[in-house]
Amino acid sequence: MDRSRLGRHGRRVGLGVLGLLLLIQLVPYGWSHPNPPVTQDAPWPDAESARIARDSCYACHSNETDWPAYSYVAPMSWAVRYDVEAGRAKLNFSTWDQDDGEADDAAETVREGSMPLDRYTVIHRGARLSDAEADRLVAALEALDRADGGGDDGDDGRDGGEDGDD
């Protein structure tokens, strides 16, 4: 192919991609950005733990999501909406009165370094956790779990129910 044909072909591909990007804006998923009411915020053990959670977790794990501008433009809007819906379904700090005891799982996920998601912290650098912040958040999540009746219940790992009268 000569240079002029390549140029025309490249322009056509570029216009096709641009047209597709404009067309996908018509797909309604991701347009709506609901923030349901907060029924009960998590009772964080201290203000610093609450700040760390708000900075690193609340965008996806609360009903207080601050929807960024890119969350209104497809295909990013689809990914953002999906992440928030999935995050709220797994653990929602804004509906603590309806908590299903997921704080211990969240502590483990933070301890492993799986949360916050890398794709989130690339864009939101303030959500990155230092080692000290991660340790503090894990301790706070474990405290929330214990306060909700989870966590260490005195079980030493042996099967219960034995009374020694056998």
Region locations from a protein language model:
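Short, Lys/Arg-rich N-terminal segment immediately upstream of the first membrane anchor
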Residues: M1-H9
